[in-house]
Amino acid sequence: MDTRADAEIKAMELIGIGVLPLAMKAIIELNVLEILSKAGPDTQLTAAQIVTDIPTTNPNAGFQLDRILRLLASHSVLSSSITKSGERVYGLTPMCKYFLPDQDGVSLAPMVVTIHDKVLLQSWHYLKDSVLKQGSLPFTEAFGMSPFEYSVSDTRFNKVFNAGMFDHSTLCMRDVLQRYKGFQGLGELVDVGGGTGGSLKMILSQYPNLKGINFDLPHVVADAPSFPGVKHIGGDMFESVPSGDAIFMKWILHDWDDGRCLTLLKNCWNALPEHGKVIIVEWILPSDAATDPTSRRVFTADLMMLAFSEGGKERTLGDYGALAKEAGFTTVKDFPCANGISVIEFHKK
C-alpha cells in the first residue's frame, strides 16, 4: 500500500474511531461478555444465540447485535469466524478477560461505562473552550457547575462514577502492592483523600501490623465502613493533614494545579516526623512525544483532567520532583508500575 493510500485509510478510520468504545459500552451493558464466558472456553456463539440470554422482545435483536459485534471483531476485541453453514460466530479474546469480573469481582468494564457515560461525553463538546477562554472547564461549560457539585445533584451518574472508580482503583492498588514494598516497617499510614478507605483496606490486608488513618472530607468519611486497624478522620487537606510515619495519596495531586499541590505537600511535610515520607500513586506523563500505547493512555488521562478537573493535569516525574523540592522534601524516589503509573516517594530527610 502506498503512503498516500495508507494515510487516507487512517484518516477515514479516525473519523469514526469514537464509535468503538461506545460499541464496547453497549455489549458491556448487555452482558455479552458474561454470556460468552459462561458458554465455556473457546466457545463461539452467533448473535442470535447470544440474544437468547438478553431480556428483549425485539425480533431484530440478533441482527442488530451482530452489527455491533462485527465491528468489535474487526478491531480484534472479539474473535470471529464463519461456520460451515455460513453463520458468523463470536468468542472471547485474551483482551476480554480484563472486562470480565476477576476473583475479586472487579474489572475495567465499569470504567468503560463511566468514561463514556452521556454526562462526561457532553463535556467533550466544549473542549475547544479550554483553549479559547481562560479558566474554562469543559464540564462546567456543559453543566454550569463543577463535577463534584454535579455528582451530588445526579445520583444516577454518581453511582456510575463511583462504580468505575472503585474497580479501577482496586486494580491499580493490586498492582502497586505486588510491585512496591515501601509500606514495610511503617507504624502508621495516613491516606489523604482516601475516600471510604478502600485503598487502606487493601494495604492493611497485606501489612496487618500497620495502623491506618483514612482522611477525607467529613461527608465522605461519614459513610465510610469500619475496617480493623483503620480510623476515619474528616477534614480539609488544604488546611492540615493528620500525622503519621508516612502519608499516602493516590490520584490526588493530578486533580489540582501547582499552587494547590504545593499547599497540600507543605501540609504533609509539617505532619511528618523527621524521617517521614509521602507516597503518591500517579500517572507519569512522558517527557517526549512518545507514540507507544502506554504513553497514549497517559496523554488520554491528561486530556480527561483538562476536561473534567479545574487546574488538574498529569505531570512528568520531573514535575513531581520539582513540587516536592519546593515543598521542602529532599529526596525523590520513583517505583514504576504498570500502564504508565508510578509510585513516587518524597522523603523529608
From Swiss-Prot:
PROSITE patterns named among the record's database cross-references: SAM_OMT_II
Binding positions (S-adenosyl-L-homocysteine): 193, 216, 236-237, 249-250
Top-level EC class: transferase
Biotechnology comment: Combinatorially expression of Sinopodophyllum hexandrum (mayapple) genes of the podophyllotoxin pathway (e.g. DIR, PLR, SDH, CYP719A23, OMT3, CYP71CU1, OMT1, 2-ODD, CYP71BE54 and CYP82D61) in Nicotiana benthamiana (tobacco) results in the production of the chemotherapeutic compound etoposide.
Keyword Glycoprotein (UniProt): no
Family matches, as PANTHER family: O-METHYLTRANSFERASE
Name this protein carries in UniProt: Desmethyl-yatein O-methyltransferase
Listed pathway(s): Aromatic compound metabolism; phenylpropanoid biosynthesis
